Amino acid sequence: EILIGLVGSEMCIRDRNTITGIADAMIDSTPVVVIAGQVATGFLGTDAFQEVDLVGITQPITKWSYQIRRAEDVAWAVARAFYIARSGRPGPVVLDFAKNAQVDKTEYTPVEVDYVRSYLPVPEMEPEAIQQAAELINAAERPLVLVGQGVELGNAQNELRAFIEKADMPAGCTLLGLSALPTAHPLNKGMLGMHGNLGPNINTNKCDVLIAVGMRFDDRVTGKLATYASQAKIIHFDIDPAEIDKNVKTDVAVLGNCKETLAAVTELLKPAGHKEWLDSFLPYEQMEEE
């Protein structure tokens, strides 16, 4: 189960001091519910002491930002906030409590939320994309898997191992994806990006099929986008459709929870061996040990 961070703040400066943390949580897919204070509803829009439009400020950097103006709305708003924060691709939610919603009394009735209209937390898996991904991997001579935090968020560590082991594919991990694959696993070739290891970084531009799983191709991993893995066919597994083609053009997009999509593709993979390709990482590993 995904745990949620809970942040409480008073009005004005303390609310605004949460902005950087909220933005980081959005980028890092960290579920957080921020409980913030606001002036009473009768003072909204009057530039009252310590009034700030926290909802307007945080809408671009949250999954949901909502102002609670009545005590009667607290139960359903809090339930919805926790559901949205932890479902699908996790992220931050802000609840801006007007003062009267904080101090008024109302009868509490427990509310459970497992659906929000127009909110689709997990896209439906597409069989055609599963088939296309498997075909590309089965035909690959130099496949490389890029492992992101989405594997951990989707609790798909076992599915990832089965996936790379069946097709004998080397893997590199992003900073937030390092815990998805044991460091001692023979197919784990280290960390990607500007602070990462030589092997996965250099061979990103030598592989023929690049498989990204639950990662967003940020600039610390890709460097110059115009030349990044330009020789490779790219498969992108992700739960968030907004990440597809955002930074790197994808040949096959596999949408859905990677626990399910990895398992589905693995079923279609042919057992393979890529000894020569795996051996190409050894010189870089030896250089780093010296």
Locate each region found by the language model.
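Anionic-ligand anchoring segments at beta-strand to alpha-helix junctions in alpha/beta enzyme folds, i.e.
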Residues: S9, V34-G37, M125-E126, Q132-L210
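Glycine-rich beta-alpha junction loops
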Residues: V39, F97-V103, Q149-V151, P241
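Phosphate/diphosphate-binding loops
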Residues: G193-I244
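Conformationally flexible catalytic loops at phosphate/diphosphate-handling active centers
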Residues: I84-A139, W277-L278, E289
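Conserved thiamine diphosphate
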Residues: F49-G88, K206, V252, T261, ...
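Short glycine/serine/threonine-rich phosphate/pyrophosphate-binding segments
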Residues: R14-I22, M26, L153-A156, D218-G223
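Phosphate/pyrophosphate-binding active-site segments
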Residues: E72, E135, Q231-E290
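Single conserved hydrophobic/aromatic residue that forms the stacking wall/gate
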Residues: E1-G8, I13
